[in-house]
């Protein structure tokens, strides 16, 4: 990992005037991940159209040793990532907050690399994800039953929270897309409950990822019962579209907020300079519904 930057700029907060949009889409990508399309400015323009106050880019982090290289930026592209987000930040200053984040891999044994990576730029938000789809993960952990593999995934999700490396855990039940036809949450509920207890003890947030509606198991990540278990434990909630195309910025956010409210949540969150900021869920829902109504006129 290259050395830590020593020329960090003075940190400033939101440049958007109060009184309008209030919420942030906290998960989206850039073409550097090799499977997303459109420049950051296009995502920002869609953020304005979606009635958001800001967006946070969380492109897939670089990894050493050619770890699943087809879905992430190369290590040599990291500075270009920081620069391209920074360019959009300046272009939309005063209109929409465009902030730098990172979707960081959790894979046992790479913690030191990830810790050092997080020091290379001034991030607003670090989203930790366990990606069971990688050949590395499948090769090491797919060595028993389907349910056993899923339990291993949830163990790693809790491990990632306990590592202290991440602000929030991304798409927490992503593993339901592993043999989706056999997914049965009640079978795993007790195990998930224990893992959520571990996560709740850390104070780390968890994401409600709306892109699950576009995956093989057609449901947000997590599903509603899982979401309710998070709410019962007081686990802070962040919402992200996981947009890989600009048109999906802010997609399904009203439905996501309604799901969260039904699950028992009263607040939703975003991160600024890696500090969690809470908003009243009803206020966020009202702001987005008003914006949708105004567009329809």
Which positions does each model-derived feature cover?
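Charged catalytic cores and adjacent phosphate/nucleic-acid-binding surfaces used
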Residues: 2-30, 40, 182-297
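Hydrophobic faces of well-ordered beta-strands that scaffold small-molecule active sites
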Residues: 24-28, 55-57, 98-102, 126-128, ...
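Non-catalytic positions within long, well-ordered alpha-helices that form the structural scaffold/packing
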Residues: 44, 48, 119, 161-162, ...
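Extended substrate/RNA-proximal surfaces in nucleic-acid metabolism proteins
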Residues: 68-202, 283-297
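An N-terminally biased module of ancient metal coordination in phosphate/nucleic-acid-related enzymes
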Residues: 4-104, 108, 178-179, 184-187, ...
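A structural motif
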Residues: 52, 123, 165-166, 235, ...
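Flexible loop residues that form catalytic
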Residues: 60, 131, 174-177, 211, ...
């Amino acid at each position: 990992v290259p050395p830590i930057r020593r020329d960090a700029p003075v940190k400033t907060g939101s440049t958007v005037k109060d009184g309008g949009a209030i919420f942030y889409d906290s998960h989206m990508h850039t073409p550097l991940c090799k499977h997303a399309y459109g420049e950051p400015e296009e995502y920002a323009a869609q953020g304005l159209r979606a009635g958001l106050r800001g967006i946070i880019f969380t492109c897939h982090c670089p990894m050493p040793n050619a770890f699943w290289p087809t879905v992430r930026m190369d290590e040599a592209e990291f500075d270009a990532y920081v620069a391209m987000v920074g360019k959009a930040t300046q272009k939309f200053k005063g209109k929409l907050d465009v902030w730098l984040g990172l979707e960081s891999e959790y894979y046992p044994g790479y913690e030191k690399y990830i810790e050092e990576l997080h020091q290379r730029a001034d991030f607003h938000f670090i989203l930790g994800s366990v990606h069971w789809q990688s050949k590395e993960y499948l090769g090491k952990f797919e060595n028993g039953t389907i349910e056993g593999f899923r339990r291993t995934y949830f163990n790693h999700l809790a491990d990632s929270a306990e590592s202290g490396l991440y602000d929030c855990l991304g798409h927490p039940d992503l593993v339901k897309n592993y043999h989706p036809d056999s997914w049965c949450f009640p079978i795993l509920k007790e195990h998930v409950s224990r893992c959520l207890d571990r996560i709740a003890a850390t104070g780390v947030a968890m994401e409600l990822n709306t892109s699950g509606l576009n995956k093989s198991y057609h449901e947000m990540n997590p599903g509603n019962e899982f979401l309710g278990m998070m709410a019962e434990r007081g686990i802070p909630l962040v919402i992200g579209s996981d947009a890989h195309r600009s048109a999906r910025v802010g997609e399904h956010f009203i439905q996501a907020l309604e799901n969260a409210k039904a699950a028992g949540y009263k607040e939703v969150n975003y991160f600024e300079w890696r500090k969690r900021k809470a908003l009243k869920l009803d206020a966020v829902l009202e702001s987005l519904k008003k914006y949708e109504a105004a567009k329809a006129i």
